[in-house]
A protein has these predicted regions:
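Non-ligating segments of multi-cofactor redox enzymes
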Residues: 1-179
């Protein structure tokens, strides 16, 4: 290899390096705001205090803890008129919980993030009678990562905490299965 060829290879590598960095997976560093589900009291501040027009906080469903109940206390109102899926019988004001029949007597519940407003009503219902498989979390793809999160400043229970970027969510421990 001649000196000229060697210089061409080195120059090509130096010119290509910045473009190759675009395709490299970036390692996340730092900390994010997150809600500790064991401290959250579903006060409603997540819905009203986020700087975004629609809160970055959403209800999440931890399927490993769910009982897939016929009567889900996160889905239905406590004082429902009838046992059906009419709007006045449901807990969620925006119809963000989608109920799907699995097999008798089990149903699966999914959260439609587009409709969820982080009011916490379903979370409160699930915690009052169910397994607590519904809880609120700051969704990383929606959050603008404010230096001083406005929700964290007004959270009455101190549920907002900083978590490492490599573990951006706090999940509840699934109930232990006794054999």
């Amino acid at each position: 290899m001649t000196l000229r060829e060697l210089l061409k290879v080195i120059t090509g590598a130096l010119l290509a390096a910045p473009f190759l960095q675009l395709f490299r997976k970036k390692e996340e560093t730092g900390y994010y705001w997150q809600i500790d589900p064991d401290k959250c009291i579903q006060c409603g501040k997540c819905e009203t205090e986020c700087v975004l027009p629609r809160s970055a906080v959403k209800c999440v469903h931890q399927y490993a803890s769910c009982g897939y109940c016929l009567f889900c206390s996160g889905y239905y109102q406590d004082k429902r008129i009838e046992f059906n899926t009419a709007g006045e019988n449901l807990r969620c004001p925006t119809d963000a919980i989608v109920r799907t029949y699995v097999e008798d007597p089990y149903f699966e519940y999914k959260i439609d993030e587009e409709k969820c407003i982080a009011c916490g009503k379903c979370v409160k219902g699930c915690a009052s009678f169910g397994n607590g498989s519904l809880f609120l979390q700051v969704r990383r793809h929606l959050c603008k990562d404010c230096n001083e999160c406005r929700i964290a400043k007004v959270c009455p229970s101190g549920a907002f905490t900083r978590v490492p970027a490599d573990k951006p969510y706090i999940f509840r421990r699934p109930p232990e299965v006794k054999s």
